[in-house]
Swiss-Prot record:
Family the UniProt entry places it in: Belongs to the small GTPase superfamily. Rho family.
Lipidated residues (S-palmitoyl cysteine): C3, C11
Subunit note: Interacts with the CRIB domains of proteins such as Pak1 and Was/Wasp. Interacts with GLUL.
DNA repair recorded as keyword: no
Gene source species: Homo sapiens (Human)
Coiled-coil region: none
Protein name (record): Rho-related GTP-binding protein RhoJ
Length: 214
């Protein structure tokens, strides 16, 4: 069975012995766009409504080094109510994507305060990539007005690079699930991190990953 595009936890492809299952788990505050990120990539469609996630699973077929692999994409709930339940999806993870919204400063600060400590406590040896989401809202008038009212501003690419270095993330990438700008690069980097988890430092430039040795 070919699971490319739009498969979920009901897919029976995990029994396909010809493909190795790679596990990517997405974490971050609620409403930062984790589900949209996964659905836009897996189904090539942006979801119309926001529904808080408890747990969901998608799978896509990827080719790495001429071999096909199943990339399991695991969505998690960011709300505090699920702090005890969420880590149940962590075992056997190959890479984590830690997400924050570039128009939600609180979600940015919670990466270092909440999410990195949780991952280091539960899965200390698994690499993680830092992802800035919702970049299409950086220039959205309503979003800018809301941030201005709260005396805040959108987070810049440089903010993401700085945080990635501070937390020991392998890379910083940013994307929009709505426009799909940078979306494929996020999951390409996740796959690369699984197979080559330690990277040499690179000079960071906007729109490209900022990688560092962890």
């Amino acid at each position: 069975m070919n699971c490319k595009e739009g498969t979920d936890s009901s897919c029976g492809c995990r029994g396909n012995d010809e493909k190795k299952m790679l596990k990517c788990v997405v974490v971050g505050d609620g409403a930062v766009g984790k589900t949209c990120l996964l659905m836009s990539y897996a189904n090539d469609a942006f979801p119309e409504e926001y529904v808080p996630t408890v747990f969901d699973h998608y799978a896509v077929t990827v080719t790495v080094g001429g071999k096909q692999h199943l990339l399991g994409l695991y969505d998690t709930a960011g709300q505090e109510d699920y702090n005890q339940l969420r880590p149940l999806s962590y075992p056997n993870t190959d890479v984590f994507l830690i997400c924050f919204s570039v128009v939600n400063p609180a979600s940015y600060h919670n990466v270092q305060e909440e999410w990195v400590p949780e991952l280091k406590d539960c899965m200390p040896h698994v690499p993680y990539v830092l992802i800035g989401t919702q970049i299409d809202l950086r220039d959205d008038p309503k979003t800018l007005a809301r941030l201005l009212y709260m005396k805040e501003k959108p987070l810049t690419y440089e903010h993401g690079v700085k945080l990635a270095k501070a937390i020991g993330a392998q890379c910083y990438l940013e994307c929009s699930a709505l426009t799909q700008k940078g979306l494929k690069a996020v999951f390409d980097e996740a796959i690369l991190t699984i197979f080559h988890p330690k990277k040499k430092k690179k000079r960071c430039s906007e729109g490209h990953s900022c990688c560092s040795i962890i």
